[in-house]
Amino acid sequence: MKEECDILIVSNYYDPELGAAPKRISAMARGFVERGNSVRVLCPMPNYPKGRVFGGYRNKLKVREFIDGVCVDRIFIYPSKSQKPFVRLLSMLSFSISLAFYLPFLNVNRTKLILIQSPPLFVSFTAVFLSNLFFKRKICLNVSDLWPQSAVELNVLKPG
């Protein structure tokens, strides 16, 4: 598969992780491929739901693999399931920082659409900002969850 792609998806979750978000994003990427598009997914090393990088991906800064015709670039994340707000914040910020170093160097000459999955807020903000700054391509921000939930999980807001 070539370096270039028609559609770039930036997501915090992707197969083989468990849960609705990785399954939904994976199905969407496969659907784009089935319709004749080349697709690249940029995501962190798989770590959800346990907050530990899965075996085979540990101690790596970048892994490229092909799953069902989709080019998947996995980059560094500091994963955590800690209940401490600072540690959770650090975990969320780590993928955004990795994006800041990786995204500007992608070859997007042929890319027609950049689809950014949100939440988390930091990832979507970083991806939208850098995509607008460097690429000038159509951006679709897919908000699949309530943003206040992120604040509840960080203990910044209380439920209810």
Locations of the language-model features?
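Glycine-centered short loops/turns at secondary-structure junctions
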Residues: 36, 135-136
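Hydrophobic residues in well-ordered beta-strands that form the structural core
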Residues: 9, 41, 74, 141-143
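Active-site-proximal region of nucleotide-activated glycan assembly enzymes
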Residues: 137, 156-160
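Short acidic, glycine/proline-rich loop/turn micro-motifs
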Residues: 83-87, 151-157
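Active-site loop signature of alpha/beta-hydrolase-fold enzymes
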Residues: 16, 47, 80, 146-149
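An aromatic- and histidine-rich active-site surface loop
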Residues: 88-103, 111-135, 141-144, 149-150
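N-terminal subdomain of nucleotide-sugar transferases
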Residues: 1-68
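A conserved catalytic-core segment of Leloir-type glycosyltransferases
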Residues: 43-106
